[in-house]
A protein has these predicted regions:
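Conserved alpha/beta-hydrolase "acid-adjacent" motif
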Residues: 246-251
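Conserved hydrolase catalytic core segment
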Residues: 100-143
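Conserved alpha/beta-hydrolase catalytic His-Asp/Glu region
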Residues: 164-220, 229
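Short beta-strand/loop motif that positions the catalytic acidic residue
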Residues: 233, 239-241
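Flexible "cap/lid" loop of the alpha/beta hydrolase fold
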Residues: 127-168
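Conserved HGGG/HGGXW glycine-rich cap/lid loop of the alpha/beta-hydrolase fold
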Residues: 10, 14-76
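Catalytic histidine neighborhood in serine/cysteine hydrolases
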Residues: 252-269
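Active-site loop/oxyanion-hole signature of alpha/beta-hydrolase fold enzymes
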Residues: 58-109
């Protein structure tokens, strides 16, 4: 496999940004979260894991960062706002990168895609890594609501609910409260993460699937649930969560028991 940065042309004509670093025998493909985030969260993985041990590939999904960004208001592009599309995109990336018997890592939304991929294309995998993602949305929504109630005052929570009902998400006080929650549960140490001068989130993609923010789950992912199929993922699987995570750890522990070959780790702070 070629290392470095490349643009892949998909069968649909769009281009995706990809980067491959390292020359080790272990192959790792990383799938970013969001939806609508980007590859930069993985840029130090090869150096930290050892470039002579692991070859790390990453890419920006359609609509994100360096990849093509369709105008989703156009009817012909609405078909690309679907879970099925992003799953097929992941498989096409694998094919074009020539990956076989590889490890797949998915963070957040990428962890959702990784589960879907393991269920449909598991024959290509050597192992699976799911970072901060559970196997359904139904148990996510009440958990983030509980986190909000634990962190903010009753009046602040009521204020946020009122803004959400009115869909006035640009309200300055509301944005401030979202920032407070994000600092507790989404990005506790921004100094350790990628730094961009401007926001790089693909908001049309994020808003469609998620909603306005991590604490409002009103998007197309509502209803996603693989609890009944999770046991069919038979490759060795690492589940990893943060001590302060928007995903409920008790569900992660249940997943560990359900998956035939799984291990769970917890990252403090």
């Amino acid at each position: 496999m070629l290392t470095g940065t490349h643009l892949l042309q998909l069968h649909n004509g769009f281009h995706l940004f990809t980067r491959t670093v390292g020359h080790g025998p272990v192959k790792l493909l990383c799938v970013h979260g969001g939806p609508g985030s980007n590859h930069t969260e993985f840029e130090n993985f090869a150096a930290e894991l050892g470039e002579d041990q692991v070859q790390v590939s990453m890419y920006d999904q359609l609509g994100s960062f360096y990849s093509d960004q369709p105008d989703y208001t156009q009817p012909e592009n609405r078909q690309y706002l679907s879970l099925d599309y992003y799953l097929s995109e992941l498989e096409e990336v694998r094919q074009q990168l020539g990956l076989e018997d590889f490890y797949l890592l998915g963070h957040s939304w990428g962890g959702l895609l990784a589960q879907e991929y393991a269920l449909k294309y598991g024959q290509h995998l050597k192992g699976l890594i799911i970072m901060s993602m559970i196997d359904n949305i139904a148990e996510y929504a009440p958990h983030v609501n509980a986190l909000r109630q634990q962190t903010l005052s009753t009046s602040q929570v009521d204020y946020m609910k009122g803004i959400e009902k009115a869909e006035a998400f640009d309200d300055p006080e509301y944005r401030h409260l979202v920032d407070v929650l994000n600092a507790h549960f989404v990005c506790r140490h921004p100094e350790n993460g990628p730094r961009q001068l401007v926001s790089t989130l693909a908001t049309p993609v994020y808003n469609y699937f998620q909603g306005n923010n991590e604490f409002v789950m009103v998007g197309a992912l509502n209803g996603w649930d693989q609890r009944k199929n999770l046991h069919q993922i038979t490759v060795p699987t690492l589940l990893t969560f943060g001590e302060y995570d928007t995903m409920p750890l008790n569900v992660g522990r249940r997943m560990q028991q359900t998956l035939p070959h799984a291990r769970l780790t917890l990252t403090p702070d």
